[in-house]
Structures are given as structure tokens and as C-alpha cells.
């Protein structure tokens, strides 16, 4: 998935105002949630073999948040990694040797999780994860359905490249 495709697809995520209001979510929180799926084009036209580099360099990702995933203001290349974002406090990066996306312990080169076989599949899978998380936040019983959440996490891992990636998405969904 290309950065531009990812940004356009995020705009299509259905934030259910009516159901969120029924849950007592404030109008401001609903607007904040909607803006967490928006990344405005900031120009520059950076071209890279890595869609994640194009995303961070060409779009304002300051409000973009998918689950616990956030994006940095700029790309930083250090050693064998291109750092592009965070999962909570830990670093998300593209491994320049393998091309895979990994989660590294904050400030260290220690890989905690393998996230995707490449950054294109990472964009595709976190888009799918965002859609599911949004649905799970408003549909009765979906959050508590551990079996379904495990199935979804494994499905997301398969989109990311296979069984090697299941653990990251299980952790992301809290199962």
C-alpha cells in the first residue's frame, strides 16, 4: 500500500457519532477521534522506496493515531533502522537489512516485536486494524469476545506477512 492510498483510506473510516454519544462520549472527544484518522498533505513531494518514509515526510501525521501507534514528525535513520513512529513509548522502525517493520525497545536496538514483512503491508494491516478498533469501540460485546479478537489479530498478522507477526497484533488488541 502506498502512503497516498493509506491516507485516503483512513478518511473513509466510519466514526459512529450516534453510538459514541450514546456511550456518553463528548463532542470534543468524537472530533478528536475523527481527526486521529486525518493526515493532511504538507507538500515536499518526497519520493522513497519506503511508503512509511513518504507518509511521514509528505503528510502531517501529528494527530494520526491507530490504537497505540503514533507517527514521528520526521524520519530518522540510525544504524540499520529508519525510525518513523512509536507504539506507546517504544520505537517503530523499518529494518534496512530485511525491509521489515519492527518494534524496538525505546532507545535501544533490541527488537521486541516483528510487525510486518515490509512497510507497505504494515500500512495495509494498520488500516485494517483501525477499522476493527473503531468497530470494536461501539459494538456491544465485541471488545469482550476474546476468541474473535484472537482470530482478528491472527488475520492481521497474516496480512502483515504470516504467523511470525501474530504476536504483535495480539498485543495490539490486548489478547
Set out the residue ranges of the language-model regions.
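Charged, low-complexity surface segments at secondary-structure and domain boundaries
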Residues: 1, 18-21, 106-110, 137, ...
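A surface-exposed partner-binding patch
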Residues: 1-93, 159-175
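Long, low-complexity, intrinsically disordered segments enriched in glycines and aromatic residues
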Residues: 44-148
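Acidic, proline/glycine-rich low-complexity IDRs
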Residues: 134-175
